[in-house]
Amino acid sequence: MPFSVTKFSLIFVALLLAEALVAQSSQLESVTRKPKPFFLVKKSMLVGMSETTEEVCQTVVLHNYEPVYGHLINGSLVEILQASGHKFSKTHVQCLEEDRPSCHGVKDDMYISECVTVYENANTMVRLFNSFGPYRLGTIRIPILCECRLRRQYRDFERPGDDDDDV
């Protein structure tokens, strides 16, 4: 009988070690399979390759920006909660000028162009500007990109030999 107890205890210890090794290898596997976070700033492939290339619209990029003020989707100005227990942080990408300037490098005789900031909605804790009430969950607008919008210009074409005097 003592032999079977010893044998059982050895088998039990071996099974525990095997289980521990399997658990450890699965933890290592899950750690190695997770992609590492990185920050990617997308630009045109041509920008920076040559001194003669430029961006179509000048943009401002603010990584991990923590705004104090923002606008709800209805346009109301709000304060954003930025406390130690709650931080709202996003990457903001917006056009340098807000008055929708023309895009650089677009033929003005063919297209009407303008640089426009595009927004997305994000939920965070807010309260109306200059109010002393509690913070509540609200949806604010976050600038995410600056795009060049084009509209085709349609013009009347003059035909050679057409004179308005013949009518």
From Swiss-Prot:
Q: Which UniProt keywords apply?
A: Signal
Q: Does the keyword Signal apply?
A: yes
The taxonomic lineage of its organism, from the top, reads: Eukaryota, Metazoa, Ecdysozoa, Nematoda, Chromadorea
Which branch of life, at top level?
Answer: Eukaryota
Which interval of the chain is the signal sequence?
Answer: 1-25
Q: What is this protein called?
A: Uncharacterized protein B0416.2
Stored InterPro entries = Cystine-knot_cytokine (IPR029034)
